[in-house]
């Protein structure tokens, strides 16, 4: 892990509980089995790059040898033109754009986060999903509210039923991502 960090001094934030003064982070390896989860002191963080900032980095980079997942992100940008909610790539595409280190493969999927502290109208959620659902490789869209995260696909397929809500301390089933508060047993201090 130390060798990997010396080669690529970037980590990703993990949505997990962390001790006071620490942030849960992940170190990427060359393969999924070479990933490591740990904690970093908040004071050790030198730069924070939000997913929505990465769209700008993509637009200013040269397109010489973009992998299929990066090309897929360009298609999503076209299809979501005008979306005012902050959004951007996470996962391997986000890591690659933020760090400059090649980690995507032709088979990597595209993970996207949409920040939605306010309720997204169901018709907007459907429209966003319909614009990307047939793209390949697969596009996984996670919506992040102020309390939890959830899969856009699950939300649009079952808008009036319970869905899996992800909290920093774990997941549980709920029916209102914007109204649910983390239960005491899952609350992060």
PLM-predicted stretches and their roles:
Residues 43-50, 162-179:
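Mature, function-bearing regions of proteins
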Residues 77-110, 114-120:
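Active-site nucleotide-donor binding segment shared across nucleotidyl transfer reactions
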Residues 104, 128-131, 158:
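Short, solvent-exposed amphipathic alpha-helical segments in soluble enzyme
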Residues 179-180, 185-188:
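Polyanionic, low-complexity intrinsically disordered segments
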């Amino acid at each position: 892990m130390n060798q990997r960090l010396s080669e690529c001094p970037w980590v990703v934030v993990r949505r997990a509980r962390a001790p006071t003064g620490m942030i849960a982070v992940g170190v990427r390896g060359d393969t999924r089995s070479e990933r490591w989860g740990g904690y970093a002191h908040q004071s050790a963080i030198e730069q924070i790059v939000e997913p929505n900032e990465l769209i700008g980095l993509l637009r200013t980079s040269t397109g010489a040898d973009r992998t299929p997942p990066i090309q897929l992100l360009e298609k999503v940008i076209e299809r979501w033109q005008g979306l005012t909610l902050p959004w951007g790539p996470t996962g391997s595409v986000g890591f690659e754009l933020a760090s400059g280190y090649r980690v995507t493969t032709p088979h990597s999927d595209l993970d996207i986060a949409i920040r939605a502290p306010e309720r997204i109208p169901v018709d907007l959620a459907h429209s966003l999903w319909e614009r990307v659902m047939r793209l390949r490789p697969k596009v996984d869209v996670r919506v992040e509210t102020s309390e939890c995260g959830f899969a856009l696909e699950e939300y649009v397929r079952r808008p009036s039923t319970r869905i899996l809500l992800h909290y920093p301390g774990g997941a549980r089933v709920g029916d209102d991502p914007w109204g649910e508060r983390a239960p005491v047993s899952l609350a992060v201090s």
